[in-house]
């Protein structure tokens, strides 16, 4: 199953490429992002929260593409805005990347994103 292979590959990666569609240009905009996995759910944390350009683009068009070192996947990214759920994502990021890096690189983690991989 493709999602099993994707999840297995993602477990080895620290960074993926996220491609969103520009809300003004309509062009694909790839960028490297950190992520965490929760079973078959890929979770993202915009570096500057609601001010992140990729997050603003996703609000306009939630269809995204991710590319790992193993393969790529297209899906629909769901915005997570409820504080408790965002805090859960932040905690998962702290486990994977370390609390000091999350504090350093994520000054305003007030939203997150979820992409189902199955």
Predicted segments — roles?
Residues 1-17:
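Extreme N-terminal tail/first-helix region
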Residues 5, 20-25, 100-105:
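Short helix-to-loop capping/linker segments positioned immediately adjacent to catalytic or ligand/cofactor-binding
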Residues 10, 25-27, 58, 107:
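A generic structural micro-feature
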Residues 13-47, 64:
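Short beta-strand segments
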Residues 49-118:
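Short, structured beta-strand-loop surface elements
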